[in-house]
Amino acid sequence: MRKWDERVPNTFGFAQSLFDFYNKPLDEELWQAQMDAIREMASHESCVIVGRNSEYILREFDHCLRVFAHAGFQWRVNRMAGKMPGVSLEQVASDVRQADKARKKSCEHYTKTRYRDAANYDLCLNTEKLGIDCAVKFVLEAAENL
């Protein structure tokens, strides 16, 4: 499943349409299953969903706090490097860059919105400046006041 996470469908134009006339591509089926699972979970209980374009999927849910935590590239690389002993800083930077590109493409393809656009969220927090613990406190405070 991780292989397909935050990917956009491959399109091969007319040739693909000949073979997929009755079938959705696997990526589209996974996107639909992900949307259904997120909506189902959010409609039955309090939960925290990280990523997955959930701010878009849950945009019509009234009691939903859409939070965007962001930080500078180098800070994120250093943080990830601390969780990946034995992996070079260059490789971690490459992985972070690749993940950013995949998230942007996924967001734009499936939601038709701009990736990292503050207008899509209720609360945006710079974890590089605030720190993780402080950001968590802000989120908890905001959630209690919904």
PLM regions and their residue ranges:
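Short gly/ser/thr-rich secondary-structure transition/capping motifs
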Residues: 28-32, 47-51, 105-109
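ATP-dependent small-molecule kinase phosphotransfer cores
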Residues: 1-46
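Conserved phosphate-donor/acceptor-positioning beta-strand/loop module used by diverse small-molecule
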Residues: 60-83, 89-99
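Small-molecule kinase domains that catalyze NTP-dependent phosphoryl transfer to phosphate-bearing small molecules
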Residues: 1-17, 88-133
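Conserved nucleotide-binding/hydrolysis micro-motifs of P-loop NTPases
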Residues: 54-56, 71-76, 130-131
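Short, amphipathic alpha-helical "lid/cap" segments that border enzyme active or binding sites
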Residues: 35, 132-140
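RNA pseudouridine synthases
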Residues: 41-44, 53-61, 70
